[in-house]
């Protein structure tokens, strides 16, 4: 691998990975009074270069996706994200955070909440997402949905719903080509978003 190809590869991976990452912020775009439900699928897009790059490559509206779960009576969002440690030495993994943080103004300038048409299916998916979070699964930097030991953001949501017997992405996948490299069968946020089983609850 020559140096030019190495640089291009590293830049591409960083752009795709960082689109699923975020920084801490005190303000949020989440509307006051919005009631979330178990299994809700939440989308966001930021204003940074990485978000725009992924949206351009994806052809969709959003660059990141997560799923709402119930944690001891409190609604939280589970999502797979790199480069956002919760403590020194933390590794890139599936994590859980508050809706306000997920939709912080540092992470997002637009967002959307979608809900599955079947409440029971959504509840099963939420429980599976919580289980995956508790397993401490690593973030999948290879974006390989054939590797069940690691997950990236869209793959996590798809896998949670598969546990309930439902595929949100169905057969929709994206291939990415950069000089010297080819990424195949990647589930992007738009592949989840286009599911006919999801209905918009709020767009902001």
PLM feature spans:
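Bacterial N-terminal signal peptides that target proteins for export
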Residues: 1-8
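C-terminal motif of bacterial Sec signal peptides marking the signal peptidase cleavage site
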Residues: 17-19
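Bacterial Sec signal peptide processing site at the extreme N-terminus
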Residues: 21-34
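Activation targets extended, charge/polar-rich intrinsically disordered C-terminal tails
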Residues: 22, 141-204
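Glycine-rich catalytic cores of cysteine/serine-nucleophile enzymes that process amide/ester linkages
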Residues: 44-112, 138-151
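Sec/Tat-exported extracytoplasmic proteins
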Residues: 46, 69, 81, 117, ...
């Amino acid at each position: 691998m020559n140096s030019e190809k190495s640089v291009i590869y590293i830049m591409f991976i960083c752009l795709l990975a960082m689109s699923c990452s975020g920084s801490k912020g005190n303000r949020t775009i989440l509307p006051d009074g919005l009631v979330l439900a178990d299994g809700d699928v939440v989308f966001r897009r930021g204003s940074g270069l990485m978000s725009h790059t992924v949206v351009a490559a994806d052809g969709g509206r959003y660059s990141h996706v997560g799923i709402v779960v119930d944690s001891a009576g409190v609604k939280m969002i589970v999502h797979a994200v790199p480069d956002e440690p919760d403590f020194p030495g933390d590794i890139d993994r599936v994590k859980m955070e508050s809706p306000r943080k997920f939709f912080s103004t540092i992470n997002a300038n637009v967002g959307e909440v979608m809900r599955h048409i079947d409440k029971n299916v959504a509840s099963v998916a939420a429980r599976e997402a919580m289980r995956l979070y508790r397993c401490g699964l690593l973030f999948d930097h290879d974006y390989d949905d054939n590797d069940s030991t690691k997950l990236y953001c869209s793959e996590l949501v798809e896998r949670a719903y598969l546990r309930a017997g439902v595929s949100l992405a169905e057969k929709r996948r994206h291939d990415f080509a950069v000089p010297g490299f080819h990424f195949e069968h990647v589930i992007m946020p738009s592949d989840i978003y286009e599911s006919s089983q999801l209905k918009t609850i709020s767009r902001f």
